[in-house]
Amino acid sequence: MSRYRGPRFKKIRRLGALPGLTSKRPRAGSDLRNQSRSGKKSQYRIRLEEKQKLRFHYGLTERQLLKYVRIAGKAKGSTGQVLLQLLEMRLDNILFRLGMALTIPQARQLVNHGHILVNGRIVDIPSYRCKPRDIITVKDEQNSRTLVQNLLDSSAPEELPKHLTLHTFQYEGLVNQIIDRKCVGLKINELLVVEYYSRQT
């Protein structure tokens, strides 16, 4: 299954705010109206919607998300929390959280087009897993820096999560540590996502 490229507002109206997909927000009360039209949600649908929320926010295919769930299931600790850490530490998401891109698809384009370096080397793989002490910089070329500066100027000022530091004038971000669960930028019940996949096998 490919990445979603359809109308974004349609998705947030059904699933709620997806900041990685779009900065738009659902209208107040739209969730209640949708729920009243469709009646009480089944447990399956609740789990499915949480899974879809995660997939659309991070811009993943179904196969990619399943792969992350399997990796998280083999790791030590809570599968749900490990899953969120894996997704949050992707390079495209780190750029988004730093404010160098307005959405994760936009961050993915920056990476794909070779504008981003990690520890001094160009990385063109959006799924690259960042680690503590990684230094993310914009390529030292005018078109790359102008592009990112425009995005930084356009992004709404938000407090950075504790695991990241941004040096705006150096076009540089630093990964301080693995993200803490409370700093995840999406309202999600990750346990329902894990439960969804456990019932598919």
From Swiss-Prot:
Q: Where in the cell is it found?
A: Plastid, Chloroplast
Give the start-end ranges of region Disordered.
Answer: 20-44
Q: Is Magnesium one of the keywords UniProt gives this record?
A: no
- The organism's superkingdom is given as Eukaryota
Keywords per UniProt: Chloroplast, Plastid, Ribonucleoprotein, Ribosomal protein, RNA-binding, rRNA-binding
Entries under Pfam families matching the protein:
Ribosomal_S4 (PF00163), S4 (PF01479)
Where does this chain mainly localize? plastid
What is this protein for, i.e. what is its function? One of the primary rRNA binding proteins, it binds directly to 16S rRNA where it nucleates assembly of the body of the 30S subunit. With S5 and S12 plays an important role in translational accuracy.
Please identify the protein, giving its name as recorded. Answer: Small ribosomal subunit protein uS4c
Species per Swiss-Prot/TrEMBL record: Aethionema cordifolium
| Gene name of this polypeptide | rps4
